[in-house]
């Protein structure tokens, strides 16, 4: 009730923050005259002066006004660009660990230099994060002269970079790279077998460009390093032949079945579900082709892998469409980023879905993979001591940034007021009418020599628009987002008079559309341009620039609404940069995905009430509000999914931290002999307690079992029964001491055969390998647990609590297994003296062999596969990402062993040999 009044009196929180920062801006401005008077050498010397002051205890906050003044003056001298006052506010926002929302064309890259320079003075390193390699190289090379003028070093990390080069890039004061590369290097560092093989320092400060794209859009997408698993391509081919025989079950809204079938498709949650008839039909077909034994159920434990293949095939056929979710190029399935429209070479869907799509398209089916290490961007970026970001559109996601990352969003005032005109949406009955109206709008703009940008949601739509324009004889350029460099060049010239560009979603393009085109690109394309040529190019550009402004600026046409308002705002933001004129219009139809799934009924009834005819459009605020409500509904659902996924991944993340801390401690340790001794004692205590229960009578002791277990785990035969017969005073504790003494004698003999130094090195290598092997299996087990945990909701149990409880038990078993398996390997192995150089060469060969088998996946979560029950036991759809289940009958670590011993598989044939 009083909120509007209080806001009127005191201003919004954002306005109050801007006022606070303006006071600091005045202090920065006061330093300007002093900085102008300095020579280049004196200005550069300021960097060393600041470092010395930090060493004496001065904080970065205290240095900020003077450091910003130095960076601003350096920008003027090196790049001919002076930071505006609002850009100084943006730099302060980044330094304070917040997200700066700045409109297109407000100079985000230049703003970043302020916070980057200030924080690089600490000597702990700054990571600048971009969405693709092209932007990382472009921004690093663009800003390198500024940083080097100030005495700072700049590095760029790229895929397939030589290790020494990458290590040097991370050691630089400022490092540029992509979110993927930073994440993969973090995982690689935690698979290293030597401290010298690691790349990254402590994660200090990161500035994320297009922060919404990385922390929101890709939050559900895990980074996975995997190795190849068994080949099951024949199974995918067989399943692919059966899927087309299944019929979709379709119902009317009232519940009347219009087409009975075998499975249902839910477009909202992107799920497919076999019904009873479908289960029966697919079981019959699988039995016919010999994939399922006669009388067996698809839901038997050993057939769950087959069931996963069936669902993968169904989803490949019914939820993934060519030229929408993926394209086929050079015999490969390339995924298309739904947010940017770019193809994503190298990324693969998990759970066998990618192989199912390859089978559907009759392509060569690539082998499945097993996860070796994984993390999510949500958990990786939360490891930084301080995190900040920049984007043109973050305010709509401010709640999620705060909830997940504790990041506040600060809307930075524009340097010039917005002059763009945003027209109301036009809604048509059919897509055909909508496209016809778009073509008419394009013709009208081109008649006035206005540049036009048409944004589409899919490659399929952009190609359809291109065909329509070709039929009309209208010249245009199409961007299907395959080559970043070419793409940036086309976008740079999309503001020329009469230019028509069709592009998939414009998120993360990183290139401004300048009215009249980009004269700097023209100059760059000339070999050794003369001053006269440059002057002529500038003069020509000035004429074109004025011509476009007089025509009304860039006109942005959107062929449909995206699920996220933020993506729509990014497309709109292409027009009207830095106070330029421009306009935007969204064209919709009731056949669009968003309208059909979420908003069509209300709008359709409204249009019928108006008695609309074919070809007519409705332009009304009520319609726009209905669409925005639908978008908010989708955004809310997607936020719930990401939050739910994070809550589950947080459990794995805590375990990941423990394992990675253990590995780092091992790598840093010179001698782990004490650790191995502790392991030996714990394993022995466990064995003795298992066979000689505390407070038990000698008649209850399983002496034969203890002798066998000691032989299995320690490779030592001990006549325990004989000792007991010979010494009546032997009790549990004294027996344990006698066994330990014998074990130490046997182990010391190994040390004599090699050397203490060689054995210590061998112990470290074995422990690291055991940790990695068991962690890999643990990841698989955790994924499978998460995959089925939603079923606990039907038993009135909280799936999250159940998942936490069971994962804790699994993790405790993992730690016990690490100790036992390490001791077992060290006890059984025969050691010999090895030349240090020979050992180093062998380890290097093994590391290279492992690296050659690794695959780096940033595979989008495969839709909303299994519903996870919420706190009340209802179902919340969640994207589940797990290791693809293979056709071989793989036993879980906690299942009974296949040999019939009655032991768990992990305690029998599942142990490390």
From Swiss-Prot:
The species this protein was found in: Pseudomonas syringae pv. tomato (strain ATCC BAA-871 / DC3000)
What reaction does this catalyse? Answer: ATP + H2O + cellular proteinSide 1 = ADP + phosphate + cellular proteinSide 2
Give the EC number(s) listed in the UniProt record: 7.4.2.8
Q: Where in the cell is it found?
A: Cell inner membrane; Cytoplasm
Chief location bin: membrane
- Please name the gene that encodes this protein: secA
Name of the protein this chain belongs to: Protein translocase subunit SecA
Quaternary structure annotation from Swiss-Prot or TrEMBL: Monomer and homodimer. Part of the essential Sec protein translocation apparatus which comprises SecA, SecYEG and auxiliary proteins SecDF-YajC and YidC.
- SMART domains in the record: SecA_DEAD, SecA_PP_bind
